[in-house]
From Swiss-Prot:
GO cellular component: extracellular region; hemoglobin complex
Protein name in the entry: Globin CTT-VIIB-5/CTT-VIIB-9
Lineage: superkingdom: Eukaryota
Assembly notes: Homodimer.
Annotated heme b binding sites: H76, H111
A Pfam family of this chain: Globin
Note: There are at least 12 different components in Midge globin. There are at least nine genes for VIIB variants.
Organism: Chironomus thummi thummi (Midge)
Lineage of producing organism: Eukaryota, Metazoa, Ecdysozoa, Arthropoda, Hexapoda
Signal peptide bounds: 1-16
Domain Globin residues, every copy: 18-161
Keyword Heme carried by entry: yes
Length: 161
């Protein structure tokens, strides 16, 4: 998986302060509301942070409008969202903590090999949260659940970069 498996950042981490069942439910339900918009999610990230787009050789240096409707873009966006969906589905159940940790650890290892920085993970987080805020019912409780999930994920990913 390429850089945008980074969407795993929107997921529940299985460390220090795992999500409660209620927090996981908020993350899962808000993700379910947008997870069918794979192309739009990836396009929003690329539009906000072109440096992330340039990490992908097949998309680097190209106008976003010219690639957004291509099969390659849709395929890649679907891979990312599917990965995210898998990890999000595992959230909120302590018996799944090892699986989440394994998936997110591999994400960090894979992205270290590609030269992805902690700052770029931060950019991705910012773009993803902005997309969610604009496209789901977003209150303080949803924001807190996503922030906790992302903080937990960063605690696993960043040391591996």
């Amino acid at each position: 998986m390429k850089f945008f498996a980074v969407l795993a950042l929107c997921i529940v981490g299985a460390i220090a302060s795992p999500l409660t069942a209620d927090e996981a439910s908020l993350v899962q339900s808000s993700w379910k509301a947008v997870s069918h918009n794979e192309v739009e999610i990836l396009a929003a990230v690329f539009a906000a942070y072109p440096d992330i787009q340039n990490k992908f050789s097949q998309f680097a240096g190209k106008d976003l409008a010219s690639i957004k409707d291509t099969g390659a873009f849709a395929t890649h966006a679907t891979r990312i969202v599917s990965f995210l969906s898998e990890v999000i589905a595992l959230s909120g159940n302590t018996s799944n903590a090892a699986a989440v940790n394994s998936l997110v650890s591999k994400l960090g290892d894979d992205h270290k090999a590609r030269g992805v920085s902690a700052a770029q993970f931060g950019e991705f987080r910012t773009a993803l949260v902005a997309y969610l805020q604009a496209n789901v019912s977003w209150g303080d409780n949803v924001a807190a659940a996503w922030n906790k999930a992302l903080d937990n994920t960063f605690a696993i990913v960043v040391p591996r970069l």
